Swiss-Prot record:
Key words, A-Z: Nucleus, Repeat, Ribosome biogenesis, rRNA processing, WD repeat
Keyword Repeat attributed: yes
Residue numbers spanned by region Ubiquitin-like (UBL) domain: 23-104
Protein name (Swiss-Prot/TrEMBL): Ribosome biogenesis protein YTM1
Species the sequence originates in: Ajellomyces capsulatus (strain NAm1 / WU24) (Darling's disease fungus)
Lineage, broadest ranks: Eukaryota, Fungi, Dikarya, Ascomycota, Pezizomycotina
Length: 490
């Protein structure tokens, strides 16, 4: 069984029910290990065939020892009906030879584990052999680490046995003085975080030789924002950080203390009256303090996210509650372009192979935006399915077309941007899987995601889909090859 809805149907069954039209299919795959010989020509099949029968046909042609469940794309769209229904719906003649791409069928991501915290979990990241932070070093299987940030003001490092092996210092020992909103691994030995205390912080991460214990030590405090710093991103090779703040600005920083200017005196804890008590508690810890390389002030509402271009670290993108996505030249600090959507933009992820930016909105959908100046429309595609704000996004590490989103509706949804339909509002995408919070149990969905809002999500090839939220949980889901790869070799 391959878990998809349509049942067994072969050519003989289809043709015995009633006379069928026939159509020629040119079957191709982008994967050499499952590709048919180049000499394979168009194949004449009944138009009544559905996915299951086509999958059986391809397996027979491949002479597979063990059947492989396949999905089929025609003109970039997954076949979800019979071929006949597809032809009728799209006004295509059965005399046409259809180019049909086949890919391995999707595998549902199953729940693997949940890690309980003391408070809401605002952010998660992964250190593994396949993560960006771990790509330059060797992280053995089973030695992966999960970083979490919480509303209790602390960072935690977890092993894969759900044990906390490191905890960041409390405020009086150089830690955050309010809730942490975001945290990311820079490398196996460095962490960055930001939060409601208006700071961006760098930490040194050190593990014992046996890996059973570790430490998170403050290295650098970065001051410049006048509001909560809700999102940060990192480009390790250039040692640069981008931050998104509720003060309407985007911060640009260096992880190197010597490259940052002095911190603005007016923003230091010692010069803010409301922080005097906290400063006394911190008096025993001395952490270097620096300011930003630049603050970009063009947005007219809180900035929700800021990221580097995945292929060019001199370009940055930011999204905001002011409905705009802005493109920045990080070398000159100038605003290059502004794209204005219909709703507040709350999250962003780059899909460079498609020249698109995915942005989650307050209107419960994801809009795919082409940031290039030559683009004639703002939204190239809309992904619908969530029932509350979409606050976090992550790319599928294996597929050019894959994306996962996290929402305040209490679910994560997996998307393949090739899975689309056209209606009166244009081209729409529909999610392939919805991942509920395990903490809900058998109670089903909660209205508006009450108590189980998702705050962050990370998709790692080794560990799986790691999400966090209002239920005080890190949740790990895994499905081998959740999406078929469509643009690069694994």
């Amino acid at each position: 069984m391959d878990g998809l809805e349509d049942g067994p149907l072969d050519a003989s069954t289809a043709t015995s029910q009633k006379p069928q039209r026939q159509v020629r299919l040119k079957l191709t795959s982008r994967h050499e290990d499952i590709a048919l010989p180049e000499s394979t020509g168009p194949i004449l099949v009944p138009t009544g065939l559905r996915r299951y029968a086509l999958s059986t046909l391809v397996n027979n042609l491949l002479e597979s020892e063990k059947p492989i469940p396949f999905e089929f794309l025609i003109n970039g769209t997954y076949l979800r009906t019979s071929i006949d229904e597809y032809l009728t719906a799209n006004g295509i003649s059965a005399e046409t030879t259809l180019d049909v791409e086949y890919v391995r069928a999707l595998v549902p991501p199953l729940h693997v584990a949940s890690f309980l915290h003391d408070d809401w979990v605002s952010a998660v990241d992964v250190l593994s052999d396949t993560s960006i932070a771990g790509s330059k070093s060797r992280v053995n299987a089973g030695q992966e680490r999960i970083l979490s940030a919480s509303y209790d003001g602390l960072l935690r490092m977890w092993n894969m046995s759900s044990e906390t092996i490191a905890l960041s210092p409390a405020a009086r020992e150089g830690g955050h003085t309010a809730s942490v909103k975001c945290a990311r691994m820079v490398s196996p030995s460095q962490i960055i975080s930001s939060g409601l205390d208006r700071t961006v912080r760098l930490w040194k991460y050190t593990e014992s030789e046996d890996g059973f214990s570790a430490s998170i030590t403050p290295q650098l405090e970065l001051y410049g924002h006048k509001g909560s710093v809700d999102s940060i991103s990192m480009h390790a090779q250039s040692h640069r950080i981008l931050s998104a703040s509720a003060d309407h600005s985007v911060g640009f920083w260096s992880t190197r203390k010597s490259e940052n200017p002095a911190a603005p005196e007016s923003l230091l804890p010692s010069n803010t009256s409301r922080s005097s008590k906290r400063r006394k508690l911190n008096s025993s810890v001395s952490v270097p303090q620096r300011g930003p390389l630049a603050l970009f002030k063009s947005h007219t509402a809180p900035v929700s996210a800021a990221i580097f271009d995945a292929k060019d670290p001199t370009v940055g993108y930011s999204t905001s509650w002011d409905h705009s996505l802005r493109t920045w030249d990080l070398v000159t600090g100038t605003l290059v372009d502004t794209r204005t959507a219909s709703h507040s933009l709350l999250s962003v992820s780059h899909m460079p192979e498609l020249s698109l930016l995915a942005s989650g909105t307050s209107a419960r959908h994801i809009t795919l935006i082409d940031p290039r100046a030559s683009a004639t429309t703002v939204s190239a595609l809309t992904l619908r399915g969530h029932t509350n704000a979409v606050v976090c996004l992550a790319r599928d590490p294996d597929s050019t077309y894959g994306l996962i989103s996290g929402s305040h509706d209490g679910t994560c949804r997996i998307w393949d941007v090739r899975s689309t339909r056209t209606d009166k509002d244009g081209v729409m995408g529909e999610s392939i899987y919805s991942i509920p919070r395990k903490s809900v149990g058998g109670a089903g969905k909660r209205v508006g995601g009450e108590g189980v809002k998702v705050f962050d999500v990370c998709w790692d090839k080794s560990v799986g889909i790691v999400s966090s939220g209002e239920d005080k949980m890190i949740q790990i889901n895994r499905g081998e090859g959740v999406l078929p790869n469509g643009g690069s070799d694994r």
